[in-house]
């Protein structure tokens, strides 16, 4: 795994349950604000999608974006996480 992807995955691991961030936000957090597409590619190639929650990263326009298990699964995961978060607070 290259250093760029490691940075992306470390940041994504910090996104709290039930919350989302944008690809642009991730790019800024790793100090590469113009690397939005590269962030998307790194997440597309996430070797551990169950552990590294790439489903919590969405497009800047609010659209859900892609996911290895499909957009419907991504939407369901996000909804489930929001519900769990409400129960925990």
Which residues are covered by each model-predicted region?
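Nucleic acid-binding interface residues in structured DNA/RNA-binding domains
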Residues: 1-89
């Amino acid at each position: 795994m290259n250093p760029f992807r490691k940075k992306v995955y470390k940041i994504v691991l910090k996104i709290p349950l039930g919350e989302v961030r944008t690809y642009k936000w991730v790019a800024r957090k790793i100090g590469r604000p113009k690397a939005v597409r590269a962030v998307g590619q790194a997440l597309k190639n996430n070797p551990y999608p169950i552990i590294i929650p790439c489903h919590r990263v969405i497009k800047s326009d609010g659209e859900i974006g892609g996911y290895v298990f499909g957009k419907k699964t991504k939407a369901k995961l996000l909804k489930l996480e929001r519900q769990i978060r409400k129960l925990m607070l």
